[in-house]
UniProtKB/Swiss-Prot annotation:
Function of the molecule: The probable reversibility of the MTHFR reaction in plants suggests that they can metabolize the methyl group of 5,10-methylenetetrahydrofolate to serine, sugars and starch.
Enzyme Commission number: 1.5.1.54
Protein name: Probable methylenetetrahydrofolate reductase (NADH)
Alphabetical keyword list: FAD, Flavoprotein, NAD, Oxidoreductase
Length: 594
């Protein structure tokens, strides 16, 4: 979806929205850290996020890779910067074609900084001289597909500022006229360069309106994180620093925490003044850090740390090809990125109902599904590379996770227990102690308010429902006992399968069971998660593979722990268990005498 359309929707609803900017890190570790941070920040619901192109066009390939992952794995509406620096038109078209094929619809068109080693911008052979040329090219070749954003400079472009007094009236006027040319050529949104004098920004907005620029103008807010970085950035951008800011920073400039605290306070006050004028969109330059940006938003009341709203139980996709998707099998609830990667390229995505899962084919398992960020890999190494001498040791690892003693699991891309799991964590601990090793679960919910902090989704005003669900590994002996006990509980349905495909079930092979649904004003029933027998047989390969590629691999070759884990992998069954009585049922009753 185009960012301009999202901004217009928010304006029509009277909502204030915000967005974040990131830049490509220089190291693989930095990239892993960025995506972990981005996942946390995106949970707060930014309107979009953008990724920079890099000084002198130095990060072109990395920017394309990051933009793709942001749009399709992080599931946030993504705007990619695109500059003219070192970019002949063929390269520009390659970049645009790539992001279009990846479902990205938003571009920030810039001239770009001078190439490395040069003081002034140099037009590359076969390339463009300015952002206006780039905007014209995008509109001419790609029509209305892309939403195009351009940069606005409240104090004029740095190249137009020749003295410490700022741009001359003529230079400022010329810069505004050029901005209007970019908008007239097809840009539909303006994001400003950083500023610290709010009055300068508000004057800039008014001046734009006076010359006929009518599109939204979004203020770019850069929190002050450290004193030296602040001086470097404002010097590079030739940004005016009000005397009161200089006076406030001088006595604390060597105290980094005090500078950050002041930066949050200053950013908050700037945003309050801007919002008071009726502007409803804020863009935060994060510098790949989260605390200051989130601190400002919390101070403004735009986010709450303890209350993160969800439009669905899983983060909805933003890729233009799958934006209507609203139904998924529950099996990948803790591995959403793996699910996305295995369903890329489907011609259609389920909307309204799951339908026939045998129609689209899931992608084959690859190393991608088992790679993990360095930080998560390190945490798994610390928490799960504990010697395994018996099956009881395995049970203890799973119990510790359910008790919150561990914050990672080989079967989850998420951090720790999810809020709804904590409702049933005592029962989960008990069945894990008995050898039913849980990897996915949800409690029964009967008409809980949709804004509940533990089980809510879909926004305020609705009610949500869930059938109790468990997914676990267990031995054949335990499975036989459970199947026998379940005969006394007619509301229980199950599917069980081992690594080799031997299976047991009390439901048809093509059965689809909605296990989560919501009722909202003026809408049809929404049922975002299902138990689908056919998809479970696809998921089981991935679930069993994690025993070796997610856990056993943490131990050295030849380690006895690997042997025990291998035996469990080859002999245990994966079980999906649903209690269809979400009003009076008790999913855990069948386990009590086992």
């Amino acid at each position: 979806m185009k960012v301009i359309e999202k901004i217009q929707e928010a304006a029509a609803d009277g909502r204030t929205v915000f967005s974040f900017e990131y830049f490509p890190p220089k190291t693989e570790e930095g990239l892993d850290n960025l995506f972990e941070r981005m996942d946390r920040m995106v949970a707060h619901g930014p309107n979009f996020c953008d990724i920079t192109w890099g000084a002198g066009g130095s990060t072109a390939d990395l920017t394309l890779e990051i933009a793709n992952r942001m749009q399709n794995m992080v599931c946030v509406e993504t705007m990619m910067h695109l500059t003219c620096t070192n970019m002949p038109v063929e390269k520009i078209d390659d970049a645009l074609t790539t992001i279009k094929s990846n479902g990205i619809q938003n571009v920030l068109a810039l001239r770009g900084d001078p190439p490395h080693g040069q003081d002034k911008f140099v037009q590359v052979a076969g390339g463009f001289a300015c952002a206006l040329d780039l905007v014209q090219h995008i509109r001419a070749k790609y029509g209305d597909y892309f939403g195009i954003t351009v940069a606005g400079y409240p104090e004029a472009h740095p190249d137009a500022i020749q003295s410490t007094e700022g741009a001359t009236p003529e230079a400022y006027s010329n810069d505004l006229a050029y901005l209007k040319q970019k908008v007239d050529a097809g840009a539909d949104l303006i994001i400003t360069q950083l500023f610290y004098d709010t009055d300068i920004f508000l004057k800039f907005v008014n001046d734009c309106r006076q010359i006929g620029i009518t599109c939204p103008i979004v203020p770019g807010i850069m929190p002050i994180n450290n004193y030296k970085g602040f001086l470097r950035m404002t010097g590079f951008c030739k940004t005016k620093i009000p005397a009161e800011i200089t006076a406030a920073l001088e006595p604390i400039k060597d105290n980094e925490e005090a500078v950050k605290a002041y930066g949050i306070h200053l950013g908050t006050e700037m945003c309050k003044k801007i919002l008071a004028t009726g502007i409803k969109t804020l863009h935060l330059y994060t510098l790949n850090m989260e605390k200051s940006a989130l601190g400002i938003l919390m101070n403004l009341g735009l986010i709450e740390e303890s209350k993160i709203s969800r439009s669905l139980p899983w983060r909805p996709p933003t890729n233009v090809f799958r934006v209507k998707e609203d139904v998924r099998p529950i099996f990948w609830a803790n591995r959403p990125k793996s699910y996305i990667s295995r369903t890329l390229g489907w011609d259609q995505y389920p909307h309204g109902r799951w339908g026939d899962s045998r129609n689209p084919s899931y992608g084959a398992l690859t190393d991608y599904q088992f790679t993990r960020p360095r930080g998560r890999g390190k945490k798994l190494q610390e928490e799960w590379a504990v010697p395994v001498k018996s099956v009881e040791d395995i049970n203890e690892r799973f119990m510790n996770f359910c008790q919150g003693k561990l914050t990672s699991s080989p079967w989850s891309e998420l951090d720790g227990l999810q809020p709804e799991t904590k409702i049933i964590d005592d029962q989960l601990v008990k069945i894990n102690q008995k050898g039913f090793l849980t990897i996915n679960s949800q409690p029964a919910v009967n008409g809980e308010r949709s804004d509940s902090t533990s089980v809510g989704w879909g926004g305020p005003g609705g009610y949500v429902y869930q059938k109790a669900y468990l997914e676990f590994f267990c031995s054949k002996e335990k499975l036989d006992q459970l199947i026998e006990k379940s005969k006394a509980f007619p509301s229980l349905t199950y599917i069980a399968v081992n690594k080799d495909g031997e299976s047991f079930s009390n439901i048809p092979t093509n059965a689809v069971n909605a296990v989560t649904w919501g009722v909202f004003p003026g809408k049809e029933i929404v049922q975002p998660t299902v138990v689908d027998s056919a998809s479970f047989m696809v998921w089981k390969d991935e679930a069993f593979e994690i025993w070796s590629k997610g856990w056993a691999c943490l131990f050295p070759e030849g380690d006895s722990s690997r042997e025990i884990l291998d035996k469990v992998q080859k002999s245990y069954f994966l079980v999906s268990l649903v209690d269809n009585d979400y009003i009076n049922g008790d999913l855990f009753a069948a386990f009590k005498e086992i």
